[in-house]
Swiss-Prot record:
<comment type="pathway">
    <text>Carbohydrate metabolism; hexose metabolism.</text>
</comment>
<dbReference type="GO" id="GO:0047931">
    <property type="term" value="F:glucosamine kinase activity"/>
</dbReference>
<dbReference type="InterPro" id="IPR022672">
    <property type="entry name" value="Hexokinase_N"/>
</dbReference>
<comment type="function">
    <text>The enzyme has great affinity for glucose. Mannose, 2-deoxyglucose and glucosamine can serve as substrates.</text>
</comment>
<dbReference type="GO" id="GO:0004340">
    <property type="term" value="F:glucokinase activity"/>
</dbReference>
<dbReference type="InterPro" id="IPR022673">
    <property type="entry name" value="Hexokinase_C"/>
</dbReference>
<dbReference type="InterPro" id="IPR001312">
    <property type="entry name" value="Hexokinase"/>
</dbReference>
<keyword id="KW-0547">Nucleotide-binding</keyword>
<dbReference type="InterPro" id="IPR043129">
    <property type="entry name" value="ATPase_NBD"/>
</dbReference>
<comment type="subunit">
    <text>Monomer.</text>
</comment>
<comment type="similarity">
    <text>Belongs to the hexokinase family.</text>
</comment>
<feature type="binding site">
    <location>
        <begin position="472"/>
        <end position="477"/>
    </location>
    <ligand>
        <name>ATP</name>
    </ligand>
</feature>
<protein>
    <recommendedName>
        <fullName>Glucokinase</fullName>
        <ecNumber>2.7.1.2</ecNumber>
        <ecNumber>2.7.1.1</ecNumber>
    </recommendedName>
</protein>
<comment type="pathway">
    <text>Carbohydrate degradation; glycolysis; D-glyceraldehyde 3-phosphate and glycerone phosphate from D-glucose: step 1/4.</text>
</comment>
<dbReference type="GO" id="GO:0005739">
    <property type="term" value="C:mitochondrion"/>
</dbReference>
<keyword id="KW-0324">Glycolysis</keyword>
<dbReference type="InterPro" id="IPR019807">
    <property type="entry name" value="Hexokinase_BS"/>
</dbReference>
């Protein structure tokens, strides 16, 4: 019986193979979508101009604020950049009341956020705050220079129109405040800040992936600025430095203001939607079922094969499939006719398997799979799985995780080739963040294997690529974008 189970696990695992020829097809299609996304709006790959036109080099100094609205918590932090690639960070996190998220008005939400900024300043920067108030109350007191510049990480779909201007396209993640849709979220926050008389200027609207790139560029060693930032975690996305003259759609976007002197701009790729039409992406029966049952069928197709939120769901569907085939004896406590999984196990709940389980399963090197047995009990309440059950699960997990890592190489290789970066530079620095790339065993190794298999990258190109973890794009990254934005504002005023 056990050999039938292991044979079936191997058969399913083979469906997740993603060979070199497929990687190459993916890269070719991604390059086509880059060109399309740079030339016009409403394309599969959004290629959003961020209006951030410079990356830091580690010498930047100053005290900046950053706030992060991306889910149920609102984070406020101050970042002191020391000018030597180091920084210190102070932060507080506040849970957003459900009624403010869903039944309030835009004014209610943004006033709530501004009040959190006020209490943070009073606790952590009271001297500065009080000095500002004193100066403002003096006759003709000009306190422009006392203002804190703030980077606003807003992790919802936004149409960005400038470095500190962007209109909300739609809410996600449980938020529903209809009167904010179509409004400039930076202006909404600034108005609430001004109503409270706070010494704060909303200097930049920040995407967390762009923040990842900026944070890496500030903290990474050496002369080379960071070229690309990528997130491989619950979701996946990338941002990279593009030549301004290639972003031809900028000419059609009205009212956009930005610094043209650097000749470059960071592009937010929004690569989760790469190849939504499935011309090149692998598409097993499990991918098809996951997509059909998701809340956005036909959308974010690349993300659904790569990011942590979905890998656990692919595994869950494979496990249920194997369990339904009684002849395999899978999870049947060593051949018993009853299943050894209680009804309340999250195995039976959509999205019930977290990626952390896959990381634990992949990492187990023990002969009897002891770590997997413990993990199955902890995560899924599965009692007494056999060693063969665990081996079958590990075989499938390995295939799902390896495919995700190899797919992750596609946008990296395509962007490197499309920009000619590998030909021009001896070193290309990439900052990455997210639970997969940080904790999934050998994720970067599998990704690099696939990069090497792209002929124009090869071993020589792979050696030029330096990948480093970049933490806290929504904190230090947002502060750095606020810094770039305030420099640009000063430059514009002096013209």
């Amino acid at each position: 019986m056990s050999s039938a189970l292991l044979d079936e696990a191997a058969r399913i695992a083979r469906q997740f193979d993603y060979p070199a020829a497929e990687v190459q097809r993916g890269v070719t299609e991604y390059i086509r979508e880059i060109d399309e996304g740079l030339s016009k709006e409403h394309t599969t790959l959004s290629q959003i101009p961020t209006y951030v036109t410079a990356v830091p080099n580690g010498t930047e100094k100053g005290l900046y604020l950053a706030v992060d609205l991306g889910g149920t918590n609102f984070r406020v932090c101050s970042i002191d950049l020391h000018g030597d690639t180091t920084f210190s960070l102070t932060q507080s996190k506040i849970m957003i009341p459900r009624e403010t998220m869903a039944s309030g008005t835009a004014k209610d939400l943004f006033l709530f956020l501004a009040r959190q900024i006020e209490s943070f300043l009073r606790i952590h920067h009271n001297d500065h705050f009080e000095a500002h108030l004193r100066r403002r109350n003096e006759k003709n007191g000009n306190c422009e220079e006392d203002l804190f510049d703030l980077g606003f990480t807003f992790s919802f779909p936004v149409r960005q129109l400038g470095i500190n201007k962007g209109t909300l396209i739609r809410w996600t993640k449980g938020f529903n405040i209809p009167d904010a849709v179509g409004k400039d979220v930076c202006a909404l926050l600034q108005n609430a800040i001004d109503d409270l008389g706070l010494p704060v200027r909303v200097a930049a609207l920040v995407n967390d992936t762009v923040g990842t790139l900026m944070a890496r560029s500030y903290t990474s060693p050496g002369e080379t600025g960071t070229f690309l930032g990528a997130i491989f975690g619950t979701g996946t996305n990338g941002a990279y430095v593009e030549k301004l003259d290639r972003i031809t759609k900028l000419q059609t976007i009205e009212h956009s203001e930005y610094d043209k002197t650097t000749g470059e701009m960071i592009i937010n790729a929004e690569w989760g939607s790469f190849d939504n039409h499935l011309s090149v992406l692998p598409n097993t029966i499990y991918d098809q079922q996951l997509d059909a049952d998701s809340n956005n069928p036909g959308i974010q197709m690349f993300e659904k094969r790569v990011s942590g939120m979905f890998l656990g769901e692919i595994l869950r569907r494979v496990m249920l499939d194997m369990q339904r085939n009684e002849s395999l004896g899978f999870l049947r406590a060593g051949g018993a006719s009853t299943v050894s999984v209680p009804q309340e196990s999250s195995l039976y709940r959509q999205w019930g398997i977290d990626t952390s389980l896959l990381s634990l399963v992949e990492a187990d090197k023990t002969e009897n799979m002891e770590q997997i047995k413990v993990a199955l009990k902890d995560h899924l309440k599965i009692e007494r799985p056999t060693t063969d059950d665990c081996k079958a699960i590990q075989t499938v997990v390995h295939a799902i995780g390896k495919r995700a890592a190899r797919l992750s190489a596609v946008p990296l290789a395509a962007i490197l080739l499309s920009t000619g970066k590998l030909q021009k530079d001896d070193l290309v620095d990439i900052g990455v963040d997210g639970s997969l790339v940080e904790f999934y065993p050998n994720f970067e190794g599998y990704m690099r294997d696939a990069l090497r298999e792209v002929p124009e990258v090869g071993e020589a190109g792979n050696k030029k690529i330096r990948i480093g973890i970049s933490k806290d794009g929504s904190g230090v990254g947002a502060a750095l974008i606020a810094l770039v934005a305030s420099k640009e504002e000063t430059r514009r005023k002096s013209q």
